[in-house]
From Swiss-Prot:
Species assigned in the record: Hordeum vulgare (Barley)
Pfam families the UniProt entry points to: Tryp_alpha_amyl
PROSITE patterns according to UniProt: CEREAL_TRYP_AMYL_INH (PS00426)
Subcellular localization: Secreted
Coiled-coil segments: none
Protein name per its UniProtKB record: Alpha-amylase/trypsin inhibitor
SMART domains noted in UniProt: AAI
Main location per the UniProt record: secreted
Record keywords: Alpha-amylase inhibitor, Disulfide bond, Protease inhibitor, Secreted, Serine protease inhibitor, Signal
Tissue expression pattern: Endosperm.
GO molecular function, one term: serine-type endopeptidase inhibitor activity
Function: Alpha-amylase/trypsin inhibitor.
Family, per entry: Belongs to the protease inhibitor I6 (cereal trypsin/alpha-amylase inhibitor) family.
Amino acid sequence: MASDHRRFVLSGAVLLSVLAVAAATLESVKDECQLGVDFPHNPLATCHTYVIKRVCGRGPSRPMLVKERCCRELAAVPDHCRCEALRILMDGVRTPEGRVVEGRLGDRRDCPREEQRAFAATLVTAAECNLSSVQAPGVRLVLLADG
């Protein structure tokens, strides 16, 4: 009888462990950001214009209006997806055929892509849009490496 009770308790503990692992897996999947699902395609179109204006000095004559629109676009992206949205702004999205679509800051002779990327990575900061960005513990927003 005591043996059956131990088996029952052990089975319950194993079941709880399996449920905990399943819940953790579902939570981690929820934290992933999918373009077109968690945020729209090309969500930062105005931010592209703003980055070019600030870094390259080309574009609209009223950069503060463009900045406000960019910040609104970035604020509309869920905070846990902002790094991914900025990555898409800088690197675009590679299709299964290998084409790069959406976003993608271009390399220009008088305006290097790395300078554009460095500035784009600051859009969530207090000096620009003053937005939070949720990241995994110990992970910094590092968007300077070419994707």
